[in-house]
Amino acid sequence: MPRTFEEECDFIDRLTDTKFRIKKGFVPNMNVEGRFYVNNSLEQLMFDELKFSCDGQGIGGFLPAVRQIANVASLPGIVGHSIGLPDIHSGYGFSIGNIAAFDVGNPESVISPGGVGFDINCGVRLLRTNLFEENVKPLKEQLTQSLFDHIPVGVGSRGAIPMLASDLVECLEMGMDWTLREGYSWAEDKEHCEEYGRMLQADASKVSLRAKKRGLPQLGTLGAGNHYAEVQVVDEIYDKHAASTMGIDEEGQVVVMLHCGSRGLGHQVATDSLVEMEKAMARDGIVVNDKQLACARINSVEGKNYFSGMAAAANFAWVNRSCITFCVRNAFQKTFGMSADDMDMQVIYDVSHNVAKMEEHMVDGRPRQLCVHRKGATRAFPAHHPLIPVDYQLIGQPVLIGGSMGTCSYVLTGTEQGLVETFGTTCHGAGRALSRAKSRRTITWDSVIDDLKKKEISIRIASPKLIMEEAPESYKNVTDVVDTCDAAGISKKAVKLRPIAVIKG
């Protein structure tokens, strides 16, 4: 017999002002406990979702996030805790905003496409400029239109980068080294990119022909949904040393934020792998609490093939953001009549928030090789970590947090506490509060546009009918999310950004 909401809550208790525990027994076969980070307002959303589920009200076909965190805690080989971040919301298998790490040395350990997501290496890139708001304001509409003209956006958009099938194979394996060779990126760009823009484990032969066909025309495209290019202004600086190290010197400075991923190619890689993993589960006797948690042993043929294909899709996403960066620099050059170099359009950083990585972490006092799944979660390594660029060794890895449309975004830095508690991971954005369907039912197109106009934000949209899905009301408050992570000590606020122009698919 299903438990009541009150009975469910008996398995959940508060550990600190920002951290809750999900005890073993909440769902069957939990190998570790669950943890999730929320403040008071985000806590209400989490428990309301669980209550609606107990009352028989659906949440878009997915289980509530609390239950998904617990189900992930039951996967074979998981270590530490199954962790939910403040922007968490229900997703396929894993919640978006769920982290889980699996011991590579344990032959039972698994890798799960649901722990990465369908948009492999969906991520964020931030470019700085030496322009200020007063320089851009007179040309803001012209710049917005130029960006819209230069960057292919929307469902089914085709890329501006000419590519042969042989080029695609190279970019899947070379990542940003391909864009550097072809002249689409600067040598400095890859130095400020997670994995330096290339996962070396990538194998293009593990990407299906169908996935390649989907990706071939989409290189250099933004796509639709919550993907965007934004011109932003530095609104507030919290950590002057960190900001200065990133080339952000004062309020009013103009930056550009890009949010996109691996397009149809990554989606197809995930779809293909789920079929293979279901076969592997039947063969190896792997039992999971939710069929959406399809997985395979990390060291099985299926597990290795998925990881190699996922790495190739991740490389495609870095190439995609690099090609869009090329388009952005061209749009700025056309608008302002200066070279991108003269405008100091350097990449501050590029982060992934949908990926699995092989990393070394301390577990029970000793180093272990782990497969860390980050779905809707951003790597946030601290100062002096060997995997972050030399330029950021003294401040920690920059972490880019995009807000919802028309709201602020943030730059954070990683912390030692985050490395200990969350495998060096923090939030990735605002996180949905309403389903896309409910957003379309309850929010009007006019109200969204009027709100942006009141904020003096220029906008260009390829798919106006989808704009209601991306309205700020559809998302959690990004400031709540970031402040919760800051209060919990898993990341530290450095800079707040506000948008002045938005390009959306």
UniProtKB/Swiss-Prot annotation:
Localization terms from the record: Nucleus; Cytoplasm
Highest taxon listed in the record's lineage: Eukaryota
Record keywords, A-Z: Cytoplasm, GTP-binding, Ligase, Manganese, Metal-binding, Nucleotide-binding, Nucleus, tRNA processing
Uppermost EC category: ligase
Reaction catalyzed: a 3'-end 3'-phospho-ribonucleotide-RNA + a 5'-end dephospho-ribonucleoside-RNA + GTP = a ribonucleotidyl-ribonucleotide-RNA + GMP + diphosphate; a 3'-end 2',3'-cyclophospho-ribonucleotide-RNA + a 5'-end dephospho-ribonucleoside-RNA + GTP + H2O = a ribonucleotidyl-ribonucleotide-RNA + GMP + diphosphate + H(+)
Residues where Mn(2+) 1 binds: D119, C122, H227
Entry keyword Nuclease: no
The protein's name in its UniProt record: RNA-splicing ligase RtcB homolog
Effect of a null allele: Mutants are sterile and few are viable. Mutants have a slower growth rate, reduced lifespan and have defective vulval development displaying a severe protruding vulva phenotype. Mutants have disrupted RNA ligase activity which results in the presence of unligated tRNAs and defective tRNA processing. RNAi-mediated knockdown results in reduced sensitivity to tunicamycin-induced endoplasmic reticulum (ER) stress and significantly reduced levels of spliced xbp-1 mRNA under tunicamycin-induced ER stress and non-stressed conditions.
Active site positions: H428 (gmp-histidine intermediate)
Further facts: Ligation probably proceeds through 3 nucleotidyl transfer steps, with 2',3'-cyclic phosphate termini being hydrolyzed to 3'-P termini in a step that precedes 3'-P activation with GMP. In the first nucleotidyl transfer step, RTCB reacts with GTP to form a covalent RTCB-histidine-GMP intermediate with release of PPi; in the second step, the GMP moiety is transferred to the RNA 3'-P; in the third step, the 5'-OH from the opposite RNA strand attacks the activated 3'-P to form a 3',5'-phosphodiester bond and release GMP.
Record-linked SUPFAM superfamilies: Hypothetical protein PH1602
Binding site for Mn(2+) 2: C122, H259, H353
Required co-factors: Mn(2+)
Any GO BP: vulval development
Organism: Caenorhabditis elegans
Signal peptide: none
Binding-site list for GMP: 226-230, 353-354, 402-405, 409, 428-431, 504
Outcome of substituting H428A: Abolishes ligase activity and does not activate the unfolded protein response pathway in response to endoplasmic reticulum stress induced by tunicamycin
Any GO molecular function: GTP binding
InterPro entries the UniProt entry points to: RtcB (IPR001233), RtcB-like_sf (IPR036025), RtcB_euk (IPR027513)
Family: Belongs to the RtcB family.
